[in-house]
């Protein structure tokens, strides 16, 4: 079985593995279920100052990461991780979803290009057929945090990461799961009563048919209230 390998291009290599070195992702890293390497883009910078950016043609605010610098760093990444699919976290990209995550895992070799400043030269995207990917309709300081988020999602889908792989079927957004792509139902644990708030009695009944019906009803109600667009295919 091939493992997931991610090559990460960044100007802040110390940010990795970051949170991915802990909890489930960290355990999976130690078990060699996934691996990574980091390339410091600044190592390919120009002049003694290792410049990696410049002013934008046509004017505008902010600096743009240079294509010659990025090209050299990407060529190095492809030498380390040939046949990899390359992703660039960007607000212009296709929105990352659970189904998109499964699609990404069809290729276990991935390269993440973490942008900074105003972004990267468009010619880099064209030259390397880079796929732009967005984690939401908001702006961050760079591509490192989205890359960590995307990798965390991918890693927990890998066999051997979760103690019980069936857990995935009862989570939000799982199209083939218990809630058919909707949001997960409300969850409860001990104590049975906390600050005068009781666990719904049906969950204590032991009647699995009624419990399953309650969970599906809860999921539908919560999805309709908070994410009604998810119901279109239900």
From Swiss-Prot:
Keyword Cytoplasm listed: yes
Protein keywords: Cytoplasm, Methyltransferase, S-adenosyl-L-methionine, Transferase, tRNA processing
Location(s), subcellular: Cytoplasm
Entry's Gene Ontology molecular function annotations: tRNA (guanine(37)-N1)-methyltransferase activity
Name this polypeptide is given: tRNA (guanine-N(1)-)-methyltransferase
Enzyme's top EC category: transferase
Gene3D superfamilies membership: 3.40.1280.10, tRNA(m1g37)methyltransferase, domain 2 (1.10.1270.20)
Main location group: cytoplasm
Catalytic activity: guanosine(37) in tRNA + S-adenosyl-L-methionine = N(1)-methylguanosine(37) in tRNA + S-adenosyl-L-homocysteine + H(+)
Any Pfam family hit: tRNA_m1G_MT
A GO biological process held by the record: tRNA N1-guanine methylation
Its EC number(s): 2.1.1.228
Protein family: Belongs to the RNA methyltransferase TrmD family.
Record's function text: Specifically methylates guanosine-37 in various tRNAs.
Positions annotated to bind S-adenosyl-L-methionine: 115, 135-140
Keyword Phosphoprotein found: no
Subunit: Homodimer.
GO CC annotations, alphabetized: cytosol
InterPro entries reported in the protein's UniProt record: Alpha/beta_knot_MTases (IPR029028), tRNA_m1G_MeTrfase_C_sf (IPR023148), tRNA_m1G_MeTrfase_TrmD (IPR002649), tRNA_m1G_MTases_N (IPR029026), tRNA_MeTrfase_TRMD/TRM10 (IPR016009)
């Amino acid at each position: 079985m091939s493992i997931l390998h991610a090559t990460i291009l960044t100007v802040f290599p110390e940010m990795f593995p970051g949170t991915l070195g802990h909890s489930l992702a960290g355990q999976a890293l130690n078990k060699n279920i996934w691996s990574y390497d980091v390339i410091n883009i600044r190592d390919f910078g120009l002049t003694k100052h290792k410049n990696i950016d410049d002013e934008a043609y046509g004017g505008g605010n902010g600096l743009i990461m240079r294509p010659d610098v990025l090209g050299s760093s990407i060529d190095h990444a492809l030498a380390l991780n040939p046949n990899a699919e390359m992703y660039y976290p960007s607000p212009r990209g296709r929105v990352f979803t659970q189904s998109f995550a499964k699609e990404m895992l069809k290729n276990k070799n991935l390269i993440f290009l973490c942008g900074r400043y105003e972004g990267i030269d468009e010619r880099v995207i064209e030259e390397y057929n880079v796929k732009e990917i967005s984690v939401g309709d908001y702006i961050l300081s760079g591509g490192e945090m989205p890359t960590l988020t995307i990798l965390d999602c991918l890693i927990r889908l890998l066999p051997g990461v979760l103690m019980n792989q069936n857990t995935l079927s009862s989570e939000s957004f799982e199209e083939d799961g218990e809630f058919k792509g909707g949001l997960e139902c409300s969850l409860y644990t001990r104590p049975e009563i906390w600050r005068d708030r009781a666990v719904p009695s049906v969950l204590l009944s032991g009647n699995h048919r009624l419990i399953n019906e309650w969970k599906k009803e809860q999921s539908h109600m919560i999805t309709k209230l908070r994410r009604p667009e998810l119901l279109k295919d239900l």
